[in-house]
């Protein structure tokens, strides 16, 4: 029985091994073809096979089920996460935001800053829709915030947080802008500046100038705002803006309204707006007037309103300087200027009066001399010319009829304007002369009149003008030889010269001095006829002009000194002293 049982058991083991081998072969064949159906069939069949025998097939199959079921379950769990990656995005509408904030958020630099700080990508989408504009089927302007896989954000939670942080930053910027606007309006902490740039010409309403100014998709206005940071809005007739059409702006011409808190940004925006308006006017073939010249023009400087800058002040300065440098003012009446023109000129010593000669002023250019210290009046004459040549030159230049045209008022004003202190000042400054014969009234040659004339010329600079008019100067005081015959006009009848019977030859009856003194070489004084001045000078020099008759005993002494006088002429030391 035991053998039979053994024989019976052998076929059972053989059959089990054959069944296992066939099952493994079948499983290997069908695993790659239909894995889902095989697993379902195996999951149902394996529980029935477990109680059949205590073999190792069951433990070997359970890990297989686990290994095969895990890869199939993972795709089912990850499938909704892949769909969430596409949905992780947010949109923030900025179409109704303030213009400056709207353009700040749409700038590429602002969006790049948000991306660097949060990791989310911000993209501008939609189209700007003006207020109260009819819908056109497109979304209004908004920001699309997303977190893409290329940003190295592996987990979904990190991407969601990045999008939330970016949206929070944008919302915070919008809140701060609204708060700043409220503060600027209520508390006036920020002073808003605004200006207008007008089109400058009337365009045809059918030409749609407003669209040309805005540009395609408002690119021109956006460019100005992006470059300067100022707010630019198109307003006025034909602008298409419905915000303030009921107000005063609806009646204004077409213009760009520039506003901002920074003066520099306003200036830059105005410059760009002017260039834009100029370009539009060229396209329409119209001549445009700049906004600064017509609307809201800046007033010109005060210098341009009052005339040339500082012209009156400069003229006053010139007049005052000229008055300081001029030694004597000219106060002659208007009708005296035509007959006797005298031009005041500057002098080296403005504290002394100008001594102007009528003869020189009529014969040649007038050259004033101040105080007897300047020799500019003798340019070209002194000291090359001899005394005789000097006298001849003066006689040629002197013209007596000129005085007849001068009115008496001018003579009186001129004579009174000459100070009497000049003669005394000159006498004090000059050293005393040495005279050979102190007891004689005249220490010169036999003709005492000539000597008296030379003394008068040396001691005083001012003489009566009437004396110059009546008789020309005598050359006797300049040269020892007798005077030329050509310079001896008849003496004046109104004069009373002090003559002596013993004096030979008689000098010309004149009280005038020599026009050119060899001592100081001064220009001759003006020839004015004034009896009051003549009488005053006669009183001052009574001892010189009216000497007592010379007795005969003194004539011999005078003849005795003729020889020595020829050698020692009193005029010589005066010339060397000057």
Swiss-Prot record:
Disulfide bond annotation, renumbered to this chain: none
Low complexity: bias regions: 493-503, 510-521
Tissue expression summary: Expressed in vegetative tissues.
InterPro entries: KH_1_KHDC4/BBP-like, KH_dom_type_1_sf, PRP5/DDX46/KHDC4_KH, RIK/BLOM7
Subcellular location: Nucleus
Polar residues biased stretches: 413-425
Biased composition (Acidic residues): 560-572
GO cellular component, as recorded: nucleus
Keyword Cell division assigned: no
Pfam families given in the database record: KH-I_KHDC4-BBP, KH_12
Composition-biased stretches (Pro residues): 472-492
Region (Disordered): 1-34, 413-578
Domain KH intervals: 206-273
Keywords tagged on the record: Nucleus, RNA-binding
Record-level Gene Ontology MF annotations: RNA binding
Subunit structure of this chain's protein: Interacts with AS1.
Entries under PANTHER family matching the protein: BLOM7 (PTHR15744), KH HOMOLOGY DOMAIN-CONTAINING PROTEIN 4 (PTHR15744:SF0)
The name this protein goes by in its record: Protein RIK
Species per Swiss-Prot/TrEMBL record: Arabidopsis thaliana
Taxonomy of the source species: Eukaryota, Viridiplantae, Streptophyta, Embryophyta, Tracheophyta
Gene: RIK
